Amino acid sequence: MSTVITSVDAGSPAERAGIRAGEQLLMINHHEIVDVLDYRFFCYDPSVSLRLREADGTTRHLTIEKEEGEDLGLNFDTYLMDEPRPCSNHCLFCFVDQMPPNMRDTLYFKDDDARLSFLMGNYITLTNLTEREAQRIIDLRISPINVSVQATEPQLRRTLLGNKDADKSLEYMRAFGEAGIEMNGQIVVCPGWNDGEHLRRSIEDLMDIGFNSCSIVPVGLTKFRKGLARLEPVTKEKAGEIIDLVDEYGARCLEKYGTRMFFCADEFYIKAERPLPGEEYYEEYQQLDNGVGMLRSTMNEFLSGLEDAESGDVASFTVATGKAAEPFIARLVAEAKKKFPQLRGEVVGIVNDFFGHSITVSGLVTAQDLVAQLKDRPTLGERVLIPANMLRHGEGVFLDDYTVEQVEQALGRRLTISETDGYSLCDAIFRQEP
């Protein structure tokens, strides 16, 4: 583990106390600091006692007075103060196993780290946890934990996760529920494996455990599945069945608990060719990051932003998105044109030749497909708008390692990056750019 302090934030409690980069944090309030969870938990109090080791090996103690919950302002070599824990499963539906060869190494790393669940919202299977670590989650009141459930029948969960001990983590879920640890769940539906009565059983078990919410999402299948288990995609009929089952239990939960608890991802409605539910269905949009309510939220936000738009005299544009969202984004652009008839713009759903045509989400569109399908398009706008989820977080790089600048050069157009909410899309369309 790395508890060596690499920098101290200016003006922070730690800087005011004279803590310097290069010192090692050993203890807070007489508790050994193992990783970032210990650090976050034990420095919450308004008065904290620190034990530090200086570069020459000597140790010193000091007490810092600060606001309750205020961060000390210490930074470490890695965010976790430790290495992320790799996944020990061999899931039948694992997307990483379906990646093409020769991509950057980080895309092949599978994490399954409870700390990243709490800190970053990652979904984890809990199969990496030891009993001691599970107890630490309870003791430190680490919450919420986001859990990849997949199934609650022990043998089925072992099979789906490719882990002979996968059923043990079901005990952790129950222990967390009894201890009041908040949990959100995710079930990836693989037709013929964990749908139908198996899905019904999983939902009923999670109701008993007491999850805050659970998303039901369709399995994603790329064209790179040679040597992997045979899985079938979610069909129109199957999508309708899943929606009906989830809505049945959602209505029960709403009556009993005041929340639907279980929500289908937008992709199910697209596949079933059914209209999206109204905004009230999604409650607080608890599962937005899993694609639950993303389209409804975007549509409502865009139309709200459109009310404040004042002029359609902007450069022509092409909105590039995934095939799944294409008709919805096209509807929004049509609404914008109703208000501003002079607006010149189009929406293009990019066919995913890179991963396979069954992959339709915008977050998996590559630069190669983007360029190939737009470069010779006669109606290509003066600006090309893309959602930020096409790029690596915080970087101007696509999944296939092409940069924004390379794509701009290939298209001869400037890219406008829009966040994935409707307000940002509206702003990007009506933005006056030099």
Name the predicted role of every residue range.
Residues A14, G22-L25, L50, C94:
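Terminal peptide-recognition signature
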